[in-house]
């Protein structure tokens, strides 16, 4: 069972690398102007489905999610041409909110405990 997890992790890594190259080259939707970053990929143990977590700069996340999920079957076939797997998992794109969450926490911490440059000068 331990080998199964290692294999799914390797496949997830490979899918992440390949999709990072395929998406900017293959998706020609004019609504997709922002830079899409694949932050994580989680592959099911049976390799039937893959959740693709992404972030995007300067774009509406719901629009980009719809674009990517609409192009999922095309991206799956493009992925199948570039990797050697018996079956390529179905792709499900999910916006990764962890980056925004981290930035929000950082802002809250800075509000509560603002960095004080004058105390550094006095020491």
Swiss-Prot record:
GO terms for biological process: maturation of SSU-rRNA. One of its GO terms (molecular function) is ribosomal small subunit binding. PROSITE patterns: RBFA (PS01319). GO terms for cellular component: cytosol. Keywords: Cytoplasm, Ribosome biogenesis. InterPro entries: KH_dom-like_a/b (IPR015946), RbfA (IPR000238), RbfA_dom_sf (IPR023799), Ribosome-bd_factorA_CS (IPR020053). It is found in: Cytoplasm. Monomer. Binds 30S ribosomal subunits, but not 50S ribosomal subunits or 70S ribosomes. HAMAP family: RbfA (MF_00003). Belongs to the RbfA family. One of several proteins that assist in the late maturation steps of the functional core of the 30S ribosomal subunit. Associates with free 30S ribosomal subunits (but not with 30S subunits that are part of 70S ribosomes or polysomes). Required for efficient processing of 16S rRNA. May interact with the 5'-terminal helix region of 16S rRNA. This is Ribosome-binding factor A. It comes from Legionella pneumophila (strain Lens).
């Amino acid at each position: 069972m331990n080998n199964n997890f290692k294999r799914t992790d390797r496949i997830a890594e490979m899918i992440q690398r390949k999709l990072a190259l395929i998406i900017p080259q293959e998706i020609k939707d004019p609504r997709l102007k922002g830079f899409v970053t694949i932050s994580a990929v989680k592959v099911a143990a049976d390799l039937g489905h893959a959740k693709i977590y992404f972030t995007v700069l300067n774009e509406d996340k719901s629009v980009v999610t719809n674009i990517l999920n609409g192009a999922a079957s095309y991206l799956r076939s493009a992925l199948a041409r570039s990797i050697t797997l018996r079956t390529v998992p179905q792709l499900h794109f999910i916006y990764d909110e962890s980056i925004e969450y981290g930035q929000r926490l950082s802002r809250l911490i800075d509000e509560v405990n603002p960095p004080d440059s004058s105390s550094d000068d006095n020491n």
